[in-house]
Every structure is written in structure tokens, then in C-alpha cells.
Amino acid sequence: MQRMTTRGVEWLSAAADDPAGCRATWADDPRAPYAFAAGRFFDVVTVDQRVGMEAFDQLLRRGLPFGPVVLDQKARRVGFFLGSRSDETFSHHLAQEAGAPPPYRYLSQSSVVVVPGPMPMTGDRYQWLRAPTRRPIANPLRPVALATMLIASAELIARVDSYSERYPSAAAFALGGFERRTTDAG
């Protein structure tokens, strides 16, 4: 879990319909979630939490470009911030990848995204996996990296799930073996 910097608060609150009201809300309660219209300063791609957490980890470990990332624990979704009007680039590169894309929602014009306050606490519904620290630097590779890692992450999770179905867990195998030995001895 991360916290926003002062410059991150300035950038994100500027995207609010009422920037001063947003800053006042967060000054009063820095944990308070706030709803923003997507499409003006940023777009957001949301995916299932399992795929999103794996994609976040892959982007981070590989040093690929990506912006703020939010987790909605109740909805079990992860949202990746992209520059506004990135939908064509994102969709194009998603279609270019070899695997099937995971189900996702692209939030842009006429969409609203709820984000955590600057200082969420453990257990809050909304968390920053990567909080905004300043106005994100425009990077045309951000939607490309996200599209690539979402497909790779979805494929990895599908393979892990398939493996788990085909081969029982070590604990189940050990327990099964133990029960057979006990039965054989008695």
C-alpha cells in the first residue's frame, strides 16, 4: 500500500470536477475515497484482482512503464491509470498479442472511477498499489506494456489453475498417501 505525495494530490485533485472541494475533503479525511470523471486527465483499465495483481507485479519487476494503480478490495478489481485517449493504442496492442485478452473495462469519457484518499489504511476498501507521486509523464509505451502484461498474466494464471486441476496439491497428495499407508497397515 502506498500513499500519495503532495504533488500527487495536486495532480489528481485537479482532475476532480471541484478541485478545491476534493482537496478540502482530503484535508479533512485523508482516507476518504473520491470519485473522478475519467477521460479528461486519465483513463483507467480495470481487471479482475488476480490478473491485475499479477500484471502489477510483472510491470514492476520488469521495470516497464506504468502509472498509478488502484485496488478495490470489495469489487476485487485492479485499475491501471493510462493517459487520456489511450484506448485505441491499448486496444490495438491487446489485439496484436498472441493470447486471448482477459475481461476488462476501459473507463474513459462518461465513466467515473473511485480512488482512495492520499493515505488509505490497511483494511480500507480502496488502496493504492502505486500512488500518484506527481503528474505522470506521458509515455506512449505505457498502454503497450499494460496490454502485453495483462495477456501474459491471464495466461499464467490459466496455466496455474489448469496445473492445480490436473495435479493435486502437495498437501492433498501427502494426506492421500498417508491415508493409504495407514489403511494398508491396518
Region annotations inferred by a language model:
Residues 1-75, 84-88, 108, 120-186:
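Signature for HUH/AEP ssDNA processing cores
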Residues 83-109:
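Helical (often loop-to-helix) elements that flank the catalytic cores of nucleotide-handling enzymes
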Residues 101-123:
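Long, charge-dense
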